[in-house]
Swiss-Prot record:
Annotated source species: Thermococcus kodakarensis (strain ATCC BAA-918 / JCM 12380 / KOD1)
GO cellular component, one term: phosphopantothenoylcysteine decarboxylase complex
Family assignment from sequence similarity: In the N-terminal section; belongs to the HFCD (homo-oligomeric flavin containing Cys decarboxylase) superfamily.
Chain residue ranges for the region called Phosphopantothenoylcysteine decarboxylase: 1-197
GO MF annotations in UniProt: FMN binding; metal ion binding; phosphopantothenate--cysteine ligase activity; phosphopantothenoylcysteine decarboxylase activity
Magnesium keyword on record: yes
Keywords tagged on the record: Decarboxylase, Flavoprotein, FMN, Ligase, Lyase, Magnesium, Metal-binding, Multifunctional enzyme
Cofactor: Mg(2+); FMN
Stated name of the protein: Coenzyme A biosynthesis bifunctional protein CoaBC
GO biological process, one term: coenzyme A biosynthetic process
Gene3D superfamilies: CoaB-like, Flavin prenyltransferase-like
Length: 403
């Protein structure tokens, strides 16, 4: 591995360590994003090899991809049978072929089994035994062409996974680098939670004082989103109930809510409608709401007294609806010692029937890191300070042991 690649290798996560990815680049102007994409895949531990069509080399120079990946770039198929070396059926073959950004021309060629460029030849070689993902990029009128749509559907039926484009400015623009990386990790990650159904909440609720002002808290939703995405990486069928103020997520099935009442209704609807294996309540839910919300904006410039009332305790409803579900609660407190924090978590276990409580002292609200104590009925395990992504991994490791 070249030195400049070592400097970024697995610096964001180790999700793709040991995975060999062929980045197959057709001749789209969006190919200019491929340097960043390759580097981001490497930051998660991937070994990336670029294959370029002749038209792609007219948009970005092969040297750019050679720098980005730290590997020789395939721009033609020679006597070294590069397509077989990269994607043939052997022990050192690629784990994934990612066609990005895929033009209408390339998609249609792949659908028809035509392999007249290095890109299409590699895909044809890999098709029978290697996962293939395609990220389209073209003008929207081309994407809407009935034959192009037919070819996309044909490939989907054959097991090819498409990363849907963003529709902006009359174009079907290639998906964001963040979404592509997320989908690649989801595709290649070990599926230890396959067959499990998981419900996760994330973000801060809002309780309105008048039509524009509300009571909320400093939660960003990062912890809940990380937990939901980690579960999806591990193969679970995930439903993420996320507040409007939460950071965004790439989880496939999401429900957006705003108030405690809306969140409770969404949770009850899910638990009444289907059986869940795990429920993780990571949202920062308001404990109080205004008893009499104003219908119009309250005028400023004068003292204001608000009468508050408690909101429903969402966690208390979960086991009433599904007694057998594995319930993970969060307990955030200030000014408590570690022993007092553990005691508060155990009270939640007794009251709500939580199987595991993630207890912390609110120091990490809105930040990228967290320091928590995992509390069960008969154990308490303090974890060192770590990123919320790392904590999500540790949490699911613990849950899997307890299921």
């Amino acid at each position: 591995m070249l030195h400049h690649v070592k400097l970024i290798y697995a610096t964001k996560s180790r999700k793709l360590v040991g995975k060999k990815i062929v980045l197959a680049i057709p001749g789209s102007i969006a190919a200019v994003e491929c340097v960043k994409l390759a580097r981001e895949l490497i930051r998660h531990g991937a070994e990336v090899h670029a294959v370029m069509s002749e038209n792609a080399t007219k948009i970005i120079h092969p040297y750019a991809m050679e720098f980005a990946t730290g590997n020789p770039v395939v721009t033609e198929i020679t006597g070294f049978i590069e397509h077989v070396e990269l994607a043939g059926e052997h022990e050192n073959k690629a784990d994934l072929v990612l066609v990005c950004p895929a033009t209408a021309n390339t998609i249609s060629k792949i659908a028809c089994g035509i392999d007249d460029t290095p890109v299409t030849t590699v895909v044809t070689t890999a098709f029978a035994h290697t996962p293939i993902m395609i990220a389209p990029a073209m003008h929207s009128t081309m994407y809407d062409h009935p034959i192009v749509k037919e070819n996309i559907e044909k490939l989907k039926k054959l097991g090819v996974e498409f990363i849907e484009p963003r529709f902006e400015e009359g174009k079907a623009k290639v998906a964001s680098i963040e979404e592509i990386v997320y989908r690649v990790i989801r595709k290649l990650h070990p599926k230890s939670l396959e067959g499990k159904r998981v419900l996760v909440t994330a973000g801060a609720t809002r309780e309105y004082i008048d039509p524009i002002r509300y009571i909320t808290n400093a939660s960003s939703g990062k912890m809940g989103v990380a937990i939901a995405e980690e579960a999806e990486f591990r193969g679970a069928e995930v439903t993420l109930i996320r507040t409007k103020s939460s950071v965004p997520s790439f989880v496939e099935n999401q429900i957006e809510v705003e108030t405690v009442e809306e969140m409770l209704e969404a949770i009850e609807s899910e638990l009444k409608g289907k059986k869940y294996d795990v429920v993780v309540l990571a949202a920062a839910v308001s404990d109080f709401r205004v008893k009499n919300k104003a219908d119009v904006k309250i005028k400023s410039g004068q003292p204001l007294v608000l009468e508050l009332e408690p909101t429903p305790k969402i966690i208390d409803r979960v086991k009433e609806l599904q007694p057998g579900v594995f319930l993970v609660g969060f307990k955030a407190e200030t000014g408590l010692s570690e022993e007092e924090l553990i005691s508060a978590a155990r009270k939640q276990i007794e009251r709500a029937g939580s199987d595991l409580v993630v207890a912390n002292t609110l120091k990490a609200f809105g930040s990228e890191e967290n320091e928590v104590v995992l509390v069960g009925r008969d154990f308490a395990k303090k974890l060192p300070r770590m990123t919320k992504r790392e904590l999500a991994e540790r949490l699911w490791d613990e849950i899997e042991k307890m299921l």
